[in-house]
Curated annotation (Swiss-Prot):
It comes from the Bacteria. Its EC number is 3.6.-.-. K(+) binds at residues 226, 245, 247, 250. It comes from Shigella dysenteriae serotype 1 (strain Sd197). Exhibits a very high intrinsic GTPase hydrolysis rate. Involved in the addition of a carboxymethylaminomethyl (cmnm) group at the wobble position (U34) of certain tRNAs, forming tRNA-cmnm(5)s(2)U34. GO terms for molecular function: GTP binding; GTPase activity; metal ion binding. This is tRNA modification GTPase MnmE. Homodimer. Heterotetramer of two MnmE and two MnmG subunits. (6S)-5-formyl-5,6,7,8-tetrahydrofolate binds at residues 23, 80, 120, 454. Mg(2+) binds at residues 230, 251. It is found in: Cytoplasm.
Length: 454
């Protein structure tokens, strides 16, 4: 398998449909056109033609589009054949194309990978293609489109350019130490560095919003049996997703629901009631519950308000709180307010949010929804926002750390060489986002998650 091969793949979803598209990219795309169509279509014009088999018989007829490189998606010669969407027809046409020497089936994401390697897209834009396809809400789709059009990349490139200018200034101060002006201590470098840090902080904040839009927030509902966990899942989901009975231990396994709160994706996970297991099935369910808790972004600690007046989680169930990961945020949910007569709403107890509601009637659930949105810092007015992945957040965080370390070196010891190195590392972290600096292993992991025809 060679990256110089001409590749072909179905660009439409598998199965039956009105239209099925095969995409070909590479130097032999011209030969495919002349062999299957009998001619080379006019560039960037739709041409209605028969698609012919090796013996001259017609396999299908449809629209052919010819995009000679480098003015194509991949930067190579690209041919698209748009025929009928029956799987048998598409399979026959694909087999016909593969009889031409030098043609092979594309790897997942290989069209986008070639576009990246031929400088038609940077890495963040290429990832945005997959994110746009996978978008689960209108806001996520709009943000992914902004990323595809270069909004995220432009912000990153602006930071890289600012760091480049700052590095030039610092390197000059190091290379010409005998000048009358001490460039390292005259305040200009510190001011420029502070500007870059402020700009980076703004991008990080937007990237966290973009990551939340893409990844969603994982919220686990946990507590003792019969506290109303499944009722809360149903209330948040707006449907009967879980079986609810008065029998303790009804939920034996993990239940998942994907919902949106004002555009914010939320993965709600209902778990088995935590107690000493009465049988092997329940024991496995409780083990899975703890696995989900340890991976959560937030835990909703469900408390049956009819069993205790306590509001401090450490007082309600100290063993449960002691087992939780140290930095895991907790929201205490006192349920069954319709029975206890407690006042609905939100308050704070020892650094934890406390919400009183009734999962059965739905009273107070809107307060919980708003709390979840606010606890993640989600902004519903993300005009011009962009999507971001975890690797982007990690690169931005690492760049911020290097800038802070560089600032400490500058102010603490006027150590120009150490500052220059921290600036270089920060610039390298940022360049990983757009692919200016990256590894083949990273590229392989990114593009392997794409659709075959992309």
């Amino acid at each position: 398998m060679s990256d110089n091969d001409t590749i072909v793949a179905q660009a439409t979803p598998p199965g039956r449909g009105g239209v099925g598209i095969l995409r070909i990219s590479g130097f032999k795309a011209r030969e495919v056109a002349e062999t299957v169509l009998g001619k080379l279509p006019k560039p960037r014009y739709a041409d209605y033609l028969p698609f012919k088999d090796a013996d001259g018989s017609v396999l299908d007829q449809g629209i052919a589009l010819w995009f000679p490189g480098p003015n194509s998606f991949t930067g190579e010669d690209v041919l698209e054949l748009q025929g009928h969407g029956g799987p048998v027809i598409l399979d026959l046409l694909l087999k016909r194309i593969l009889t031409i020497p030098g043609l092979r089936i594309a790897r997942p994401g290989e069209f986008s990978e070639r576009a990246f390697l031929n400088d038609k897209l940077d890495l963040a834009q290429a990832e945005a293609i997959a994110d746009l396809i996978d978008a689960s809400s209108e806001q996520a789709a709009r943000s992914a489109l902004n990323s595809l059009q270069g909004a995220f990349s432009a912000r990153v490139n602006h930071l890289v350019e600012a760091l480049t200018h700052l590095r030039i200034y610092v390197e000059a101060a190091i290379d010409f130490p005998d000048e009358e002006i001490d460039f390292l201590s005259d305040g200009k470098i510190e001011a420029q560095l502070n500007d870059v840090i402020a700009d980076l902080d703004a991008v990080r904040a937007e990237a966290r919003q973009g990551s939340l839009l893409r990844e969603g927030m994982k919220v686990v509902i946990a507590g003792r049996p019969n506290a109303g966990k499944s009722s809360l899942l149903n209330a948040l989901a707006g449907r009967e997703a879980a079986i609810v009975t008065d029998i303790a231990g009804t939920t034996r396994d993990v239940l998942r629901e994907h919902i949106h709160i004002d555009g914010m994706p939320l993965h709600i996970i209902d778990t088995a009631g935590l107690r000493e297991a009465s049988d092997e099935v329940e024991r496995i369910g409780i083990e899975r519950a703890w696995q989900e808790i340890e991976q959560a972004d937030r835990v909703l600690f469900m408390v049956d308000g009819t069993t205790t007046d306590a509001v401090d989680p450490a007082e309600i169930w100290p063993e449960f709180i002691a087992r939780l990961p140290a930095k895991l945020p907790i929201t205490v949910v006192r349920n069954k307010a319709d029975i206890t007569g407690e006042t609905l709403g939100i308050s704070e107890v020892n650094g934890h949010a406390l919400i009183r509601l009734s999962a059965r009637t739905g009273e107070g659930v809107d307060v919980l929804r708003n709390h979840l949105k606010q606890s993640m810092g989600f902004d519903t007015n993300m005009e011009g926002g962009f999507l971001a992945r975890r690797r982007h957040l990690q690169a931005l965080e690492q760049a911020a750390e290097h800038l802070q370390q560089g600032k400490a070196q500058l102010l603490g010891a006027w150590a120009g060489e150490l500052l220059a190195e921290e600036l270089r590392l920060a610039q390298q972290n940022l360049s990983e986002i757009t692919g200016e600096f990256t590894s083949d292993d990273l590229l392989g992991r990114i593009f392997s998650s794409f659709c075959i025809g992309k």
